[in-house]
A protein has these predicted regions:
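Phosphate-binding beta-alpha-beta segment of Rossmann-like dinucleotide-binding domains, i.e.
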Residues: 99-150, 162-165, 314-317
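Rossmann-like dinucleotide-binding domain for NAD(H)/NADP(H)
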Residues: 95, 228-334
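Glycine-rich Rossmann-fold phosphate-binding loop(s) that bind the pyrophosphate
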Residues: 156-157
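Phosphate-coordination loops involved in phosphoryl transfer and adenosine-cofactor binding
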Residues: 2, 147-150, 219, 228
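Rossmann-like adenosine-cofactor binding region
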Residues: 58-61, 175, 179-273
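An N-terminal-biased, well-structured beta-alpha scaffold segment characteristic
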Residues: 1-96, 198, 218
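A short helix->loop->beta-strand "cap" motif at the edges of active sites that frequently abuts
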Residues: 66-71, 91-93, 172, 227-229, ...
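Short, conserved active-site loop motifs that form the nucleotide-linked donor/cofactor pocket
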Residues: 24, 93, 188, 279-281
Length: 334
């Protein structure tokens, strides 16, 4: 049987697609923006594998459109909320993602957002671009210090720990809350979420988007934070209730925010109201966006596909889906 791989983008960084093309026939979506589920489903029949970006929809309809030949869905992302994991498990389809390779790069961007939000860099740069710098004033664009501040990390996996390491250079006190983190280290002190929210000057979110974490930060959590605090998120947009955050920012009950992710992505011309707030720094989901890291993500996704198609265990299966890798991948699904 011919090996056919559907990629949700026709062009990806690095040489991963060229490697994949040497082992399989490729069919790709070449539109603009985010592909609609029906666009991908139309290309899916007969696919052996799907290589998808982190916010491209991989639903039951796509899996069914691919048919019984489908063995693996490989995400070129760490997040996996775009995949119907239950549907994949029911159909015996392996699902993989790309943890590890993007942790340090995303931690860099997290710290960039911390600095930009606390020091009001976005508003200051916009003022300069408008030609407003006509007079030096001691009270222009006063921000808040990062050095010596208390940093609270919600989620203490690879990215959270990488952020904690960077915080040491700023002399920060670091707290973290993660009920699933078994390991402890000298970088951070584990606390409950209530303590973290009450004591942190900066709260940074590093959790996947699941039913449990959707709107993890909403009105109650924002009210528990200091009015001088900053909220930063490089995880997934749905973890933060954007309406609640906008209310807190406009009311002045929260100092600032730095966001790389949003509930609706991509936005196009219809921006989130948060993008216009002078105390909010917004970016278009670029946490892993360096040449080397994005290429490494594609390479790992391709490696996962090739491993499964060669009847080997995938390198980075999704958490909680190990049983999918124990089944023989040759033959069709029942």
């Amino acid at each position: 049987m011919a090996i056919r791989v559907l990629t949700t983008r026709g062009e990806l960084p690095g040489s991963g697609l060229r490697r994949l093309a040497g082992a399989a026939g490729l069919v790709s979506w070449h539109g603009t923006g985010r592909p609609a589920p029906e666009d991908l489903a139309a290309l899916a029949p007969g696919s052996t594998a799907v290589l998808a970006l982190g916010n491209d929809p991989v639903d039951a309809a796509l899996l069914d459109a691919a048919g019984p030949s489908l063995r693996v869905v490989a995400l070129a992302s760490m997040g996996f909320d775009n995949v119907d994991r239950a549907a994949a498990a029911e159909r015996g389809v392996v699902v993989t993602h790309t943890p590890g390779v993007l942790a340090e790069t995303t931690a860099d961007l997290t710290f960039a957002l911390i600095l930009a939000a606390r020091r009001r860099l976005g508003a200051a740069a916009a003022s300069l671009a408008r030609g407003d710098w006509g007079l030096f004033r001691m009270d222009d664009y006063l921000g808040l210090d990062v050095h010596g501040a208390t940093l609270g990390l919600v989620g203490y996996g690879q990215i959270g720990r990488a952020v904690a390491r960077r915080a040491q250079g700023f002399g920060m006190r670091v707290l973290h809350h993660d009920p699933y983190a078994a390991e402890t280290d000298a970088l951070s002190t584990p606390v409950d979420l209530e303590t973290l929210l009450a004591e942190a000057d900066i709260v940074s979110l590093h959790v996947p988007l699941t039913a449990e974490t959707r709107h993890l930060v909403s009105h109650r959590e924002l009210a528990a934070m200091k009015p001088t605090a900053t909220l930063v998120s490089t995880s997934r947009g749905g973890v933060v209730d954007e309406e609640a955050l906008l209310t807190a920012i406009r009311a002045g009950t929260l100092h600032s925010a730095g966001l790389d992710v949003f509930e609706r992505e991509p936005m196009g011309a219809e921006l989130s109201p948060l993008a216009a707030e002078p105390y909010v720094v917004t970016l278009p989901h670029i946490g892993s966006a360096t040449e080397r890291t994005r290429a490494a993500m594609v390479d790992l996704a391709v490696d996962n596909i090739l491993d499964v198609l060669r009847d080997r265990p995938a390198r980075t299966p999704l958490p909680g889906t190990a049983s999918a890798y124990e089944r023989p991948v040759s033959g069709s699904r029942s």
